[in-house]
Amino acid sequence: DNLRLRGFPIENNEQVLAAATPTGHCEQAGYGKNCRRQWVASQARVLLMAGDSLGDFVQAEHNTLAAQRQAVEPYVGWFGQRWFLLPNPTYGNWYSAPYGDREEIPFAQKRFFKREALQLQQ
């Protein structure tokens, strides 16, 4: 209803695929998007995708920088053409990837890994 209240042309609730929405014969718990992407692709031609996190486009096996690079490598040419990444500096899988989702490490160490990740890669 929030989308309708903001003027989006939503005719019914089936047009919104929120987290954990059952789609076809695909069962996936949590916030993974693979099932929803597959279902939409079977129903319609997807012209472009926009998101604020890498997981909006592909699913990396682990939340590390190396795994993210590997997951996106086949699609790198799609960014800016078919896929559009919207900046969101406060949220996304990229945020904890530099320290491999290890939330138990000290803040200073997390900051160090983030700064290291900002250095240009050759």
Listing of model-derived features with the role each one plays in the protein:
Residues 2-122:
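C-terminal cap/substrate-recognition subdomain and adjoining C-terminal extension
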